[in-house]
A protein has these predicted regions:
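Residues at structural and domain junctions
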Residues: 22, 41, 45, 75, ...
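Short hydrophobic/aromatic-rich motifs at helix boundaries and adjacent loops
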Residues: 26-30, 56-60, 101-105, 115-117, ...
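Short, charged/polar connector segments at secondary-structure boundaries
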Residues: 1-102, 113, 119
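Amphipathic alpha-helical extensions and coiled-coil-like segments
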Residues: 8, 123, 127-145, 149-196
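Switch/connector loops and helix/strand junctions flanking conserved nucleotide-binding motifs
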Residues: 107-110
Length: 196
């Protein structure tokens, strides 16, 4: 099924993952799913099961239409971008997935992963806030720089999203569960847990 979507002459299965060259894009290749692991630093914590099942059905019928991006590590590869496609491919019973292998510094890998996920619209507000916090604290980016890298958000919008991390735990849980929206939670910032 991959062969009909991606010409096999573009695939390179001889990539050397021990290369130290930073920010190198490899040729497109198939990689065994068993050699790939999710990145524990990825901002997305929850995956919608129905959406994954739908994507898996599409992968079964049409193949993986967009390669994932991975970086080599000691055990194989870590996902930089495309964890949903990876999980859907597992559910679809695929053995290999098309992937671009990029050799990146750990900082660049985390930054790309965070930005790729932030550019998607389906992160919950707390996942977004946590990703902004990592970009600010680990990479010393200003709010303006974060806004530019994630698609033109204003510094004020970034700041307001970061404030959600100061919510009481019960309010954060309600946002993640979808029981309340971000705007409904804002007045609760700074209140003690016992009041909420």
């Amino acid at each position: 099924s991959f062969d009909s979507l991606i010409p096999t002459e573009l695939l390179d299965e001889s990539f050397d993952p021990t290369s130290e060259q930073d920010d190198r894009v490899s040729d497109l290749r198939y990689i065994k799913l068993s050699e790939i692991a999710p990145d524990p630093d990825q901002p997305r914590r929850a995956f919608d099961e129905v959406s994954l099942d739908e994507l898996a059905a599409s992968v079964k019928e049409h193949g993986v239409l967009q390669p994932i991006v991975v970086a080599p590590d000691k055990q194989g590869y870590k996902i930089v971008a495309g964890e949903r496609r990876f999980r859907a491919s597992q559910r679809a019973g695929l053995e290999k997935i098309p992937a671009l292998v990029r050799t990146l510094s750990s900082q660049h890998k985390l930054e790309l992963s965070l930005i790729e996920n932030l550019q998607r619209s389906d992160l919950n507000p707390l996942e977004t806030a946590t990703a902004y916090l990592k970009l600010r604290d680990q990479f010393n980016l200003t709010l303006e720089e974060i806004g530019q890298r994630v698609g033109g958000k204003t510094s004020a919008a970034i700041s307001n999203t970061l404030r959600l991390l100061r919510l009481p735990a019960s309010a954060r849980d309600a946002i993640v569960a979808g029981d309340i929206r971000e705007g409904q939670a804002r007045p609760l910032i700074g209140l003690p847990e016992s009041v909420v």
